[in-house]
Structures are given as structure tokens and as C-alpha cells.
Amino acid sequence: MRRTIAVSPAPTLEPQPPWNRQRRLLLLSPLLALPAARAASNLVATPAQMLGPFYPLRPDAAAGNDLTTVDGKGRAQGRALRIVGRVTDTTGRALPGLLVEIWQTNAHGRYHHPHDDSAAPLDPNFRGYGRATTGMDGAYRFATIMPVAYPGRTPHVHCRLSRGERELLVTQMYLPDATAANARDGLFMSLREAA
């Protein structure tokens, strides 16, 4: 039986110290265009999006959920934050044991990937890729940095969910406060048009 995946509620960004503000920033999956007041029993499936060219060539099984350091040797540049979310099916039932992978650019707009030929500098302390397994309640969390825009794209974080060798969903998460950049991003706008 095939299950449709919903990320509910949409993942949130929580600024980490020293930027610990009262306000929680919302990092939305493609659910951005959907009404936030939907009941858990009436969830809408998170739309799939492209994997993109910078998924790791060899995903690091030991990467863990902290993208802000590589082997504990210093901290990544950029504004530290946490991505916190929960994966359910469209009835609201938690999906435990899923592998959640994320990857994104560093604070300069460059991916940690050999095919990214951007002139932007690399950050030796930013991993660029992380992985976590959903708990019994479908929850996951990541420590990373605020994503930044680069030419042609709004700030975003790529996300892939799988169980074993079976890919269940590839999507992207967006910042609701990046309204001008979001409006210029074709992939983001295609989600709004489809909703």
C-alpha cells in the first residue's frame, strides 16, 4: 500500500544562540501555499520537487544532523538555526524510521559539491549535507545555517525522504520571509500556481 507523505506542521527554523530571539522563524516545505489551519485528518501531501544537481555524489552515512561543523573543528559561517519537523501520512499518522536528508548552500551561496563551479568561497566548517532518522512520532531535527539565495534561486533547503533503498519524497523547503526572492524563483512559483 502506497502512503502519501505530508510534512506536518511545516518544519520550523529556530534561531540558535547567540541569535536566540523570541520569534520562531518558519522554514516551510512546499506547504507554504496551503492554508495553515488544515486539520490533521485533512493534510495535503507535500509536493515533490526536483533533486537538483548538487545532491552528494557519495552521501556520508556518518554525517549526522549537525551541518554546522566538520569533525568538530570550528563552526560554520552564517546564522545558526535548527530545522525541526514531523513526517506523517495524510491522515496525520506519524512515519517513524524514515531517513531524512537535507543539503544546502553555505553562507556564501555555494554547495559543498565538486560540480558547483561558483566563484563563491567554500566554508571548511560547513558540511552542507546532513541526515536524521524520524522518531516514533515522525519528528526530526537539524542544526544548520540560514540558507541564502544564489543567482536564479531563492533561499531553500533540499530534502529527501527514504526508507531503505526506496525514495519516498524529494522536495525543497523555503523561507516565508524571502517574499521578493520567492516571487522571482520559478520552482517556488510553480508550487504556488499548482496549489
What would you call each of these model-derived segments?
Residues P18-N20, R24, A40, R160:
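Compositionally biased, intrinsically disordered low-complexity segments enriched
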Residues M1-R21, L28-A36:
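N-terminal secretory signal peptides
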Residues A40-A195:
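Beta-strand-dominated extracellular/periplasmic modules and repeats
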